[in-house]
A protein has these predicted regions:
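Interdomain/boundary linker segments immediately adjacent to catalytic/signaling cores
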Residues: 74-130
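Conserved catalytic cores of phosphodiester-cleaving nucleases, focusing on short active-site segments
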Residues: 140, 144, 165-169, 178-186
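A short acidic/basic microdomain associated with nuclease active sites
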Residues: 145-170
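Major-groove recognition helix of helix-turn-helix-like DNA-binding domains
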Residues: 48-66
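Eukaryotic helical DNA- and histone-tail-recognition domains of regulatory proteins
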Residues: 8-34
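Acidic-basic catalytic patches of nuclease active cores, encompassing PD-(D/E)XK
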Residues: 120-153
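Catalytic cores of nucleic-acid endonucleases
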Residues: 182-231
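Short, charged amphipathic recognition helices of the HTH superfamily
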Residues: 3, 26-45
Length: 252
């Protein structure tokens, strides 16, 4: 059994997500922070670079094998490659399986750089926030070539560079770049937060900074683009949060 996400093929990750949702049903759904299967299909499918319908189809394929209320594809046995995944991973307990699904989208790495917003934020809500953020980034990558405002741009993913935006776009190798910060919302409306770094960069770059908001993961994702968001229709209010850090010291 392979538990290293780097060694698991992309299609197998989609199959495993479907298997997890079929086997653990609404309990598993809740552990990932989702309220409905549709939002889980949308977020996980897009985050893994696949289609939401693929996750649903794999879940339905496994449904007849587990005691959940859905009939699934009861008229036939799982396809050989799905049966092979079931044979290898079907006995995983819910916590181990959930951790595996989270690892597909770099949960541990993101958790180390994007701490919970507050002590009260539950792990499931935290997981959903990170999953939704990655899904929004993948959504942007998929639609960017067809957006006239970013047409013919070379795109660099800067999410791991800590530079205050997620993507750097250039039309010419030596020309000025455009910065795109991507945010994701479950609903059509919701709160959007900028970190201190993101706000500073947005202010400095002005019209070269874009806020790309992916909305409605709960049903059908769509997007809205805000150029120079600090000067546009959005009103940002500064919030301060005090973090208490505890350490233990000893003299040697």
């Amino acid at each position: 059994m392979i538990l290293d996400p780097q060694q698991i093929p992309d299609r197998e990750k989609l199959i495993l997500a479907g298997l997890f949702l079929s086997k653990f049903d609404k309990v598993g759904l809740g552990l990932l922070g989702f309220d409905t299967f549709t939002e889980a299909f949308n977020v996980i499918g897009i985050a893994l670079g696949g289609k939401p319908s693929s996750i649903k189809n794999y879940r339905d394929e496994f449904d007849p094998l587990f005691p959940n209320p859905r009939a699934g594809w009861h008229h036939r046995s799982p396809r050989p490659y799905c049966a092979a995944v079931l044979e290898e991973y079907g006995d995983l307990d819910i916590q181990t399986f959930c951790a595996l699904i989270k690892s597909f989208v770099g949960y541990e790495a993101k958790a180390s750089t994007q701490p919970p917003k507050s002590r009260d934020e539950k792990e499931s809500a935290y997981a959903r926030r990170l999953l939704t953020g990655l899904a929004a980034e993948r959504y942007f990558e998929s639609v960017q070539p067809g957006l006239s405002i970013f047409k013919s741009c070379a795109v660099e993913n800067t999410t791991r560079l800590g530079c205050g935006y997620d993507f750097r776009l250039r039309r010419k190798a030596e020309g000025e770049f455009l910065a795109v910060e991507v945010k994701g919302l479950m609903e059509m409306t919701g709160g959007i937060s900028l970190t201190q770094k993101e706000h500073e960069v947005a202010e400095a770059l002005s019209f070269r900074f874009f806020l790309f908001v992916v909305k409605n993961f709960r049903e059908t994702p769509c997007h809205e683009i805000y150029r120079d968001p600090l000067a546009g229709p959005l009103v940002f209010e500064k919030k301060k949060r005090i973090v208490v850090q505890v350490s233990w010291q000893a003299s040697a």
